[in-house]
Amino acid sequence: MDKLDWQKLIHIKVHCEDVESFIKRFGCDYDVFVNDRAYFNAVAMCVFQIGELANSLTPEFREKTKKDMPWDMIRGMRNWLAHSYGEVDAEVLWETANNDIPKLKEFCIKVLS
């Protein structure tokens, strides 16, 4: 694996762990998530950063692993967050944080081990 891809996967994993820690800290409650701007923005920023990092993975790595990880969707989430102009769908972000981020973390752990 390319050294830069390796480093980016480490950073992606750290952002996944950050999202998990925010959920533990603030609670796994959707109403708290949508009403606490610090919680919401912390998760959104991590998801945004994950998308940025995914975008900078080499095309070869993304192609090789696309059956295991939907890189285009991850990159699309970054674009959606960047260009939604205050119209971020909290439910989509919540589902991403609770369902997709743990899978991405496990993928990173597997590839990095």
Predicted regions and their residues:
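Solvent-exposed interaction patches of small proteins and small membrane subunits
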Residues: M1-S113
